[in-house]
Amino acid sequence: MNFETVIGLEVHVELSTNSKIFSPASTKFGGDPNSNTNVIDWSLPGVLPVMNKGVIDSGIKAALALNMDIHKSMHFDRKNYFYPDNPKAYQISQFDEPIGYNGSIEIELEDGHKATIRIERAHLEEDAGKNTHGTDGYSYVDLNRQGVPLIEIVSEADMRTPEEAYAYLTALKEAILYTGISDVKMEEGSMRCDANVSLRPYGQEAFGVKTEVKNMNSFSNVKKALDFEVARQAKILRAGGEIRQETRRFNDKTGETILMRVKEGASDYRYFPEPDVPRFEISDEWIEQMRASLPMTATARRAHYINDLGLSDYDARQLTATKEVSDFFDQAIKFDTDPKLVSNWLQGEVAQYLNSEKKELHEIGLTPENLTEMIRLISDGTISSKIAKKVFIELAKNGGSAEEFVKKAGLVQISDPDLLLPIIHEVFAKNEQSVADYRGGKQNAAKALVGQLMKATKGQANPTVAQKLLYQELDNF
């Protein structure tokens, strides 16, 4: 029997607010255990949560970016469960009135196939702390993450392959990243994904029994976990067995999913309205204010780059892969620089440098101003492309003005024939055999002479001018 795969994803996105959702403690990633905490995070008797308005702002932006309806009147709920990293023994979340509902996002697969994935809901909640199990036999609780604001985005079960799930995550990350409400870095835990997967015979409308898969720290691991889980369930069903509703953990070393626990239902959490957080009324004016603050989406930027700036689809996609690079590009072309040249540098030397140094664009000295200044120096013949690579390294490491560095370092390209001719004659004198070979019909000998000329000028000779002069002198020698 053949089965159809049914996949739904629950994605937790950590919001980039300076303070926590109900506490004034910092949300900064890292730091010593329990250093970014407050009495509210510790859940001391008598303390009350205070809502961070910026979290609701971010929730509205996310809902707008995902084409969602917004609950104009909403409240928070208590989700009750006991665990050491949850000192209150309940989590403040949203149950029946999430901030956003009935959304959608378009995905595109590698083969160009497009599909629309519906989004059931997006609700705001607080994160839990973190347990660490030491080798000394003790378990330790770090509450730095306790109370960090999250938005959980729950898709409908519209995905039918692991590839579609991967494409959905890619599109979702891009949509959220461009709102500016989160950096969506899976490696730092600011984007986490749980997958619900089930199988059903083709033609059957009812869903099969689902399993939830956790502990996937990359998009590729989500795909691997789904591939394994689909195969595991299919094997059980074909053998006449039954699938249990359970939670499983993905082991990235073995590529397998492992049973964690039998899955709880919503009733197990005994949701009820949170009495210490008031109901919030979201006005149309508030929504429109958030809409006006949203930057141009990645999709809109790609269309602008292709239709207005003449870039290729490939270039447009590379530039919009991260908002930081896209913002940098947009600033750079304001300096009246050829968009294609800026694009080439960002995709070439800049990307290579960032990869090798394991840094992000804002962490180096390169700016839209000094990059475009350097490109102009290439275009007007002041420096060669080869010298520009040296200039770029200097700018990346130390910042500053490209023009000032070129002058200070003596890297200005030599284009004056009166300066080049004596050097050319000196090269001929030192390489008489190569000159004789060229005059004897060996055209490649001239290339060796060009190389010697560039060496003699330490790469500062204008290649076009130098080569033209050298050939003229060879023919007249």
Swiss-Prot record:
Biological process annotations from GO: glutaminyl-tRNAGln biosynthesis via transamidation; translation
Stored SUPFAM superfamilies: GatB/YqeY motif (SSF89095), Glutamine synthetase/guanido kinase (SSF55931)
Domain of life: Bacteria
Reactions catalysed according to its record: L-glutamyl-tRNA(Gln) + L-glutamine + ATP + H2O = L-glutaminyl-tRNA(Gln) + L-glutamate + ADP + phosphate + H(+); L-aspartyl-tRNA(Asn) + L-glutamine + ATP + H2O = L-asparaginyl-tRNA(Asn) + L-glutamate + ADP + phosphate + 2 H(+)
Its EC number(s): 6.3.5.-
InterPro entries: Asn/Gln-tRNA_amidoTrfase_suB/E, Asn/Gln-tRNA_Trfase_suB/E_cat, Asn/Gln_amidotransferase, Asn/Gln_tRNA_amidoTrase-B-like, GatB, GatB_C_1, GatB_Yqey_C_2, Gln-tRNA_amidoTrfase_suB_CS
Coiled-coil annotated residue ranges, if any: none
A Gene Ontology molecular function term of the record: glutaminyl-tRNA synthase (glutamine-hydrolyzing) activity
Subunit structure, interactors included: Heterotrimer of A, B and C subunits.
PANTHER family: GLUTAMYL-TRNA GLN AMIDOTRANSFERASE SUBUNIT B MITOCHONDRIAL AND PROKARYOTIC PET112-RELATED, GLUTAMYL-TRNA(GLN) AMIDOTRANSFERASE SUBUNIT B, MITOCHONDRIAL
Stored HAMAP family: GatB
Family assignment from sequence similarity: Belongs to the GatB/GatE family. GatB subfamily.
Role description: Allows the formation of correctly charged Asn-tRNA(Asn) or Gln-tRNA(Gln) through the transamidation of misacylated Asp-tRNA(Asn) or Glu-tRNA(Gln) in organisms which lack either or both of asparaginyl-tRNA or glutaminyl-tRNA synthetases. The reaction takes place in the presence of glutamine and ATP through an activated phospho-Asp-tRNA(Asn) or phospho-Glu-tRNA(Gln).
Name under which the protein is recorded: Aspartyl/glutamyl-tRNA(Asn/Gln) amidotransferase subunit B
Naturally occurring in which organism (per UniProt): Lactococcus lactis subsp. cremoris (strain MG1363)
